[in-house]
Amino acid sequence: MPKQTLDGNTAAAHVAYAMSEVATIYPITPSSPMAEIADEWAAHGRKNIFGKTLQVAEMQSEAGAAGAVHGSLAAGALTTTFTASQGLLLMIPNMYKIAGELLPCVFHVAARALSTHALSIFGDHADVMAARQTGFAMLSSASVQEVMDLALVAHLATLKARVPFVHFFDGFRTSHEVQKIDVIEYEDMAKLVDWDAIRAFRQRALNPEHPHQRGTAQNPDIYFQSREAANPYYLATPGIVAQVMEQVAGLTGRHYHLFDYAGAPDAERVIVSMGSSCEVIEETVNYLVEKGEKVGLIKVRLFRPFSAEHFLKVLPASVKRIAVLDRTKEPGSLGEPLYEDVQTVLAEHGKNILVVGGRYGLGSKEFNPSMVKAVFDNLAATTPKNKFTVGITDDVTHTSLEIKEHIDTSPKGTFRCKFFGLGSDGTVGANKNSIKIIGDHTDMYAQGYFVYDSKKSGGVTISHLRFGKQPIQSAYLIDQADLIACHNPSYVGRYNLLEGIKPGGIFLLNSTWSAEEMDSRLPADMKRTIATKKLKFYNIDAVKIAQEIGLGSRINVIMQTAFFKIANVIPVDEAIKYIKDSIVKTYGKKGDKILNMNFAAVDRALEALEEIKYPASWADAVDEAAATVTEEPEFIQKVLRPINALKGDELPVSTFTPDGVFPVGTTKYEKRGIAVNIPQWQPENCIQCNQCSLVCPHAAIRPYLAKPADLAGAPETFVTKDAIGKEAAGLKFRIQVSPLDCTGCGNCADVCPAKVKALTMVPLEEVTAVEEANYNFAEQLPEVKVNFNPATVKGSQFRQPLLEFSGACAGCGETPYVKLVTQLFGDRMIIANATGCSSIWGGSAPACPYTVNRQGHGPAWASSLFEDNAEFGYGMALAVAKRQDELATAISKALEAPVSAAFKAACEGWLAGKDDADRSREYGDRIKALLPGEISQASGEVKDLLLDIDRQKDYLTKKSIWIIGGDGWAYDIGYGGLDHVLASGANVNVLVLDTEVYSNTGGQSSKATQTGAVARFAAGGKFTKKKDLGLMAMSYGYVYVASVAMGASHSQLMKALIEAEKYDGPSLIIAYAPCINHGINMTYSQREAKKAVEAGYWPLYRYNPQLAQEGKNPFILDYKTPTASFRDFLMGEIRYTSLKKQFPEKAEQLFAKAEADAKARLEQYKKLAEG
């Protein structure tokens, strides 16, 4: 049986592909890779056990995927799907149907937390526990090897039992963990298949040659009996699963049972658990048993149907106390599901055993051997705590167990490494390659696990790698490391990088610093650790190499090469060969240029790696005096700072609000300093157009106006020039960047229209101190009121952006649109945001990029789910309209009351203009100013009325409702709701950030994806044309619709936004957003949008129903006949060139079709414009 190094998702996909004929799919983290892998294999013609290629169909949602599974099963095809979290919840209605009809299938679930008070993409069992009542059998895998083996068990057992299965494993901890495992080959799987059961399944299919009816409506006289008729199948299922497990054991030599026991044969204290925790608990149990403790573990494999007989069979007779661990929370219940099952079994069978239950690991919270020890210690207590939590500090309801002892249970001889990377720098990908190289080319076992934060890029990634001669069960993070690598120098001093490094260990740093500079650059505590632990210290300037070669910020291959050179895991010459082989495999479809650059990176890394010889005096390095910290809000000190220092696990429950509310305007405190280069203003070249500010994805560069008198005390480097324009006469102008908030994308410099660029990119290190002082001075300047037209680029950019310093990718094409909307309407905006990229860069705790102006006003932002965002926003609009109507009623009554003439005039003005933003604000401000005096003079009912108006005064200014999301939401999963909301006529504004892929889940195709584009779920290129969402919305006749592209036309974008917001009805703005998933250089993302329009790839138009009411043509075509080559545009993006490289004939056909579709679309729009 061959060994391969792969992750849990790949293991599941390997089996599902073999055993299925059809897969209906939809992306959701962390299950998406299963579907992506299946789609890619199908695109390349891989055969399953039936000798056929799996038919893969992407659906519009998980509900659609489950419905298609149901239909495919009903028609006689063995069908599977892959999902997690909210996706599984959307499948539940169909799961009841599939189970009720006894249709055999397997849903593979990378178990993940559900959205409650907050979204979490990380792992626990909340989703699968929500599906436990559907009638699906539920089989749990604890490791990557188990995923391979038990996936096969599930597929084999469902055929025999006719009961459908959920095969689940922990999201990220198992789905993304890389392990060296035995791979079951397809011909061996086929030998175990019950072919008679497959034939019987097909004979039961819907077939007009042998028709039958299913899915009837039943009355009270027979429904109950029919429901009970399936009992024998569920009673037989545990025995069938046990039988199949024995069959698989005969093939693999690995024995599984419905419940497996590990530990002392005479154990008195036992933990019952399932999922990856079992690996941690078993490792700990082995450690404790060696020390003489009578402890054990029962691993739950088959959770549904729960077999009391099989559970009791493995329970040692000596057991006195049991702790049941659940990785889910059921508020209001007497206990979590597994706990209640165990209690029931023991009570029904008269077992006098004390049982306590506890929760652990919610949202991928760390669960390690020290915590396992705490659970066993609790069981040993005189009165064990019940309904406990472990892994957190609960200082509110005091459920948590104390961790009294920290233990190291991992096998001796295991080499442990930690790598600190920057999101999008390639560190995680390189480490996955390293694991595979070591796993596939040595006799060592290998494990890799990767920790991310939620920033789209630029966040911290920590890779945990283990290698050793013994199997690795350590499904927890490394706290004692042999090697630690820091791939970004900005982490030095920010994080305790060397915490837990072993004496004599290795420290690898990527920095521009020379050996001589290290003494001044490294903090004292780091120098002390290096010297006292006698570390081997290496440095390499990977950024310099990457930039010289042309790889930009991608330092992955360079750092991987450096690792192999110093780690001595395998001979360096062999490692270099394997690295270059992996480069071909990873980047081959991206072209020879990319390949050669990466080959050069390997060679340069070998030459550039330098060992740093440090003085013994570092052992006595003295800490510098702490810098004076400016006064900060309590939230920043107690929540944001600890979380950003990677100390969030230490925060107690009392730190957090129970409803998930977080303050706004907190990203400005992060100061991540992740850019390599930042823009520096050259005032003599600047024409003061403000385009740089407009396109900045992170609002890091802004124009400032100041009165000369206010510049007293400015830093010497704070150079200004006379402001241009009569509106700014007598004022000074400056463009200023926030150096530590800039991500260094370079779009500002690229779009600068000056003959000689007014912005030049310079190394952050060289200018940080100067530009930080300049920025701090600029921010404290008094606000200058100017009358620049806010409907222009220049005027809009003098308004404060109320979206700043988000976690979006450098060069992001989405954020500039939303930032601009906040500059135009932000102080009265309410935003409903669909789950997706924009909810992650816009709403990842603890730092909120939405902020407030100097009056304390700013966007109120909320996110519900992926599929319901339009309805969520519509509900907001209904509520706001209701509140404003109540206010209008009260103000109307005030007109009849004995109030002052001035107050009455203000009320009359407001009632006449309440639906106009400017007028409602003007008269609303008058009412607010007059209210205190009116209230003080009033009495009785009039005073009560005025107090009621005062309570509702927040609704005096007209609110602007915005529904924001990506194309995956608008074109696919949320389209039904979006269509309904647009059809309703409600006064809402919809902004679709169209990246033409599901950007948030990794770049899967949507109905916005263009013909011929290669995306995940469209590995062979997309065959169908892009859905024309705008044209569909125009068909109503009363929806404002615009298609815009910031990089192509600023003026058209400004017109569209202002017209849409002003329009009294639904508006839809579809915005082209270049994305890293397109395979472009994000320094030129704005330029890429311009090219898209010039080539006829993306249309610019506005459809304004208001014009039709004036007797004019409502459709305005804002782009001309293409002036550039459509094909050249496609060849500038890897999402298209990769198809040409892999499938040249197919590419030619699809590219021709895409171009023809674009031309046909333009002709259609021209006809609309002609009326």
UniProtKB/Swiss-Prot annotation:
Q: Which Pfam families match?
A: EKR, Fer4_7, PFOR_II, POR, POR_N, TPP_enzyme_C
Q: Where does Mg(2+) bind?
A: 967, 995, 997
What cofactors are annotated for this protein? [4Fe-4S] cluster; thiamine diphosphate; Mg(2+)
Keyword terms: 4Fe-4S, Electron transport, Iron, Iron-sulfur, Magnesium, Metal-binding, Oxidoreductase, Pyruvate, Transport
Cofactor binding note of this UniProt entry = Binds 3 [4Fe-4S] clusters per subunit. Binds 1 thiamine pyrophosphate per subunit.
Q: Where does pyruvate bind?
A: 29, 112, 1000
Top-level EC class, please? oxidoreductase
Q: What is its EC number?
A: 1.2.7.1
Please indicate if the UniProt record lists Transmembrane helix as a keyword.
no
Where is CoA annotated to bind? 424-428, 456, 556, 598
The residues the record assigns to binding [4Fe-4S] cluster 2 are 696, 742, 745, 748
- Give the Gene Ontology MF terms in alphabetical order: 4 iron, 4 sulfur cluster binding; iron ion binding; pyruvate synthase activity; thiamine pyrophosphate binding
Positions that bind [4Fe-4S] cluster 1: 686, 689, 692, 752
Q: What residues bind [4Fe-4S] cluster 3, as annotated?
A: 809, 812, 837, 1075
> Which residues are in the 4Fe-4S ferredoxin-type domain?
677-706, 733-764
Picking any one GO biological process from the record gives: response to oxidative stress
Q: Indicate the family of this protein.
A: Belongs to the pyruvate:ferredoxin/flavodoxin oxidoreductase family.
Q: Which function does this protein serve? A: Catalyzes the oxidative decarboxylation of pyruvate to acetyl-CoA and carbon dioxide. The two electrons that are generated as a result of pyruvate decarboxylation are used in the reduction of low potential ferredoxins, which provide reducing equivalents for central metabolism. Also catalyzes the reverse reaction, i.e. the synthesis of pyruvate from acetyl-CoA and carbon dioxide. Appears to function physiologically in both directions. The oxidation of pyruvate by PFOR is required to connect glycolysis and the Wood-Ljungdahl pathway of reductive acetogenesis.
| The protein's name | Pyruvate:ferredoxin oxidoreductase
This chain's source organism reads Moorella thermoacetica (strain ATCC 39073 / JCM 9320)
